[in-house]
């Protein structure tokens, strides 16, 4: 990149950052936000690969309930959409509060995205939600590059 172009882009980036509370601002509205929220994250449980996945998920749910987190999120590589995994999914459902799913790169090893959405009860591969004055955005980063296209 040429020096002049770099300096121009740097200046534009700095100008964008100085515009407060506009569409370009990504800070939460702290006047609406609760003082503190807590949530539990679990990732790479790999039900279909790890023999102790049920036990590990049970411990996660127990700890989330014990710590009284506001909600839980599983960050992908959870379980395939197969009848044998209904018991595992039922463990997840024992958490009494809000819970969210995110597709992982291995979740579609045996199933389509559509099958995973149906099995987990996800609204879409990407979605957003508000909690405690904060806005959370879940994105789908799982796109395969095949035949020169995504």
PLM regions with names:
Residues 2-3, 112:
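Helix N-cap and loop-to-helix transition residues
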Residues 3-27:
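N-terminal export signals
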Residues 11, 46, 79, 106-107, ...:
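Short, glycine/serine-rich, charged loops/turns that create anion-binding
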Residues 11, 74, 102:
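Short glycine/serine/threonine-biased micro-segments
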Residues 12, 66, 94-97:
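Secondary-structure boundary motif
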Residues 17-18, 59, 92:
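A short hydrophobic/aromatic micro-motif that marks alpha-helical segments and, especially, helix-coil
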Residues 22-87:
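N-terminal active-site segment of His-dependent metallophosphoesterases
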Residues 83-150:
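Extended active-site neighborhood of metal-dependent phosphoesterases/phosphodiesterases
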């Amino acid at each position: 990149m040429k020096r002049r172009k770099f300096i121009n882009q740097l200046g534009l980036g700095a100008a964008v950052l100085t515009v407060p509370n506009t569409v370009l601002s990504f800070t939460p509205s702290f006047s609406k936000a609760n003082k503190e929220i807590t949530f539990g994250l679990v990732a790479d449980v790999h039900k279909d690969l790890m023999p102790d996945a049920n036990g590990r998920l049970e411990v996660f749910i127990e700890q989330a309930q014990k710590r009284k987190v506001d909600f839980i999120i599983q960050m992908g590589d959870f379980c395939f959409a197969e009848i044998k995994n209904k018991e595992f999914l039922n463990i997840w459902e024992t958490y009494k509060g809000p819970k969210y799913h995110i597709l992982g790169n291995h979740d579609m090893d045996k199933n389509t995205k559509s099958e995973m959405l149906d099995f987990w009860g996800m609204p879409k591969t990407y979605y957003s939600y508000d909690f405690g004055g904060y806005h959370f955005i879940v994105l789908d980063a799982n796109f395969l590059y095949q035949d020169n296209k995504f």
